[in-house]
Design a protein with these regions (language model features):
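A beta-strand-loop signature enriched in Asp, Gly, Thr, and Trp
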Residues: 268, 307-342
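Short, contiguous acidic/charged loop-to-helix segments that flank catalytic cores in large enzymes
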Residues: 269-273, 298-303, 325-331, 379-383
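Mobile, glycine-rich extracellular loop/lid and propeptide segments
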Residues: 1-236, 241-263, 277-302, 309-314, ...
């Protein structure tokens, strides 16, 4: 997890013409928590923008005399002012629905998602797994904040903490859950779970996947929760095939049928793809009829000469079952999260990643071959204050990297 929180809201014009600051009471000290490595705690999950409401939505950990709270804010893009009816206190909203949400033990790390007029917020636990936390998804209506829905894991634990948060495809939501504690039967952890927009979860095996050794993964803290599920589409002889890729802290990749996740042990392909834990926000792109997925992690099957690299790119293509191979690996030092840019939405993909907490440089690679096209430049282009899971923001002609008290921009 990031060791520093965002305590204020900043709005920056992409050409650096204006900078707006919206100070908000959005932090709570670690002393108010049972454990964690962030002090103070504030906004640690990536916010989401809804152009239809001209607002940005975020979750913040707030400390008050009555205790710690999680609140979901909606701020106007124009001036950062809170919208009417916001913020929504998660504990109070769920109590009204007859559910118990322990704000002290829950943390919010994953990116927020908007689908069909609802903002969805994932929750997990703190670093150290203290307290009675569960994996939660809470949905709040973007234009009616009193409309609140939720889903949570049955067992303690099962946090939804991956930096990439919640994925959506085909009008449905997909989350990856972490390790549970004391579960003798599967209770929602170590899994990819499909949720309807109203956050109903079917018990049909078509609507969840867990590895066959989920109990062993629980015991080793080697769960699926470190990476969000990635929806993919590949071309086949008969048309297209919709898939989900899940990546585990045990270094394995699980390829799933998006329309039939398979239940316990029901993956189409399970393959060791990393020699270390995978904890990142992956990026996907298409070349021809194949899907490519880039993730930060040391590839287990890197083609020569790029062995022992920290960026791995998988290629998923047509087959029975689909073929999954390591396309290429990129050399860098650091633990950022990749993004992909193209010239028109699909052509000339470039994979970008920051060497956070490593070489602290920006790296760019051709998406098809892995050829390096930018390797950080001179000494004046080393960035300070980068943190693990660091991602980038792309606009039409710039890449932005946010660091501790700094904003870096790179021109295309």
């Amino acid at each position: 997890m990031d060791r520093r929180a965002r305590l204020d809201g900043y709005g920056v014009h992409s050409q650096f013409k204006t900078v707006r600051t919206e100070p908000l009471p959005l932090h709570r000290p670690r002393s108010s928590l049972g454990c964690d490595n962030i002090d103070p705690l504030g906004i640690t999950g990536t916010p989401v923008i809804d152009p239809s409401t001209a607002a940005i939505y975020l979750n913040a950990a707030v400390a008050e005399a009555s205790g710690p709270w999680h609140r979901v804010f909606a701020l106007a893009l124009q001036d950062g002012a809170p919208l009417p009816g916001w913020p929504v206190d998660v504990t109070d909203a769920l109590r009204s629905a007859g559910k118990k949400f322990n704000a002290r033990d829950q943390n919010q790390r994953g990116a927020l998602t908007i689908l069909d007029g609802t903002v969805y917020v994932p929750f997990g636990g703190h670093y150290g797994d203290c307290g009675d936390y569960h994996g939660w998804v809470v949905g709040v209506g973007t234009t009616n904040p009193r409309r609140v829905t939720s889903w949570s894991t049955d067992a303690r634990g099962g946090g939804i903490w991956a930096p990439g948060g919640i994925s959506s495809a085909g009008g449905e939501l997909f989350v990856a859950t972490g390790n549970t504690f004391g579960a003798s039967t599967w209770s929602g952890g170590e899994a990819v779970v499909r949720l309807a927009p109203d956050l109903h979860r079917s018990t049909d095996k078509r609507d969840f996947f867990a590895p066959p050794d989920w109990q062993a993964l629980d015991a080793r803290d080697a769960d699926l929760g470190g990476t969000n599920p990635i929806p993919l589409r590949i071309e086949t002889h008969n048309g297209v095939q919709d898939l989900i890729l899940a990546l585990g802290k045990d270094g394995r990749a699980y390829l799933l049928d998006q329309h039939n996740l398979g239940g316990i042990g029901g993956s189409l392909v399970a393959q060791r793809v990393s020699s270390g834990p995978i904890r990142t926000a992956p990026a996907s792109y298409a070349i021809g009829g194949d899907a490519y997925v880039a993730f930060q992690g040391p590839g287990a099957r890197c083609p020569p000469p790029a062995q022992h690299s920290e960026l791995t790119v998988l290629k998923i293509g047509m087959g029975e079952p689909p073929r999954m191979t390591t396309a290429w690996c990129g050399a860098l030092g650091g633990v950022g999260s990749p993004i992909v840019t193209t010239t028109d939405g699909h052509s000339d993909p470039i994979v970008w990643i920051a060497g956070a907490e490593g070489d602290n440089r920006l790296h760019g690679f051709r998406g098809d071959t892995g050829e390096p096209i930018f390797i950080g430049g001179g000494s004046n282009e080393v960035m300070t204050g980068l943190r693990h899971f660091q991602t980038l923001i792309a606009t039409e002609n710039r890449l932005f990297v946010v660091a501790d008290g700094r904003l870096y921009a790179f021109a295309f």
